[in-house]
Amino acid sequence: MPRKAAQPSLSEQQAAPGGVGAVDRAISLLDVFTPDRSMLTLAELAEESRQYKSTVLRLLASLMHSHVVKRHADGRFSLGSTIPRLHAVYAASFSMESTVVPALRELVDATRESAAYHIRQGAKRLCLYGVDSPQTIRDHTQVGALASIRSGAAGRVFTVFGNAPAAPGARQPREPFVITPADVTREVAAIAAPVFDATGALAGVIALTMPAMRLQRKHAADVQRTARKVTSELGGRYPSMT
C-alpha cells in the first residue's frame, strides 16, 4: 500500500469549498505545467502535484480523452489541443478594461484613496486606467498621462520587477510592493504593486496615491490583494519573494 504523502496535495491545499474533489485534483495537475516545463513525465507530475502515481494516471486518462493533455511517444505529457481552443474563446470575451477598472474601484472603496493601473510605454509609464478618491482632498488620477519610469512608486515597480533600468542606489524590496512617502512631489505618497501576465512577465502596476499626510502602510495589503486579483485574471501567478 502506498504511503500517505508527507504534505497535503496541491488539490487539498487549493480545494474549492463545496467543489468536486476530482476536478480539484485534475486542475492541480494542469497547474504543474509552465512555459519552462511544458513536457513532464508521470513521475514529475505526481511529485509536483503531490499525488499518487495511480491517481495521476486516472486523471490523465480523462484529460487525454478530452484532449486537455497529450501523451507523446517518449512517454512524457504536455497540454493538449483543447487548451488553445479554450484560450481562443476566452480571448474573444476578455476585456482588459472590464478586468482592471472594477478591481480599481474595489481598491478605492476599501481605502478611499485614488487608484490607477500603469503600463510601460518605452522609457515612460502610461496611466491606462484610473479611479479617483471620493474625498475632497485627493490625488487626481490623470488617465493617459505619461511619467518617468524611474520616478514614483509605480516607476520603481517597473525597475525592480520588470526590465527597466533602475535608478542609482535602488534596492530589491523584500515584499511584492513599493511604498514611497513622497511619490513625485512631497505632497503625494504612493503604494504600488506589480501585476504579472500568464508568461510571468510584468504586465503593469497597480498604484494607490494619496496626500502624504494620509499614507497608511496597512493599505499595502489592499494594493497587493488587487494586484494579485488582476494577475490571476490575466492567467499569471505571483512569484515567491523568499
Where on the chain are the PLM-derived regions?
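A structural signal for short hydrophobic beta-strand segments in well-ordered beta-sheet cores
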Residues: 69-70, 117-118, 195
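N-terminal helix-turn-helix
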Residues: 2-90, 221, 232, 236
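Residue-level recognition of short loop/turn positions
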Residues: 74, 122, 198-199
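Juxtadomain coupling helices with adjacent low-complexity linkers
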Residues: 165-170, 174-187, 202-242
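A short, hydrophobic, proline-anchored segment that marks a local hinge/packing element in signaling
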Residues: 191-199
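Amphipathic alpha-helical effector-binding/dimerization core
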Residues: 78-164
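Short, structured helix-loop boundary elements
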Residues: 19-23, 76, 80, 93, ...
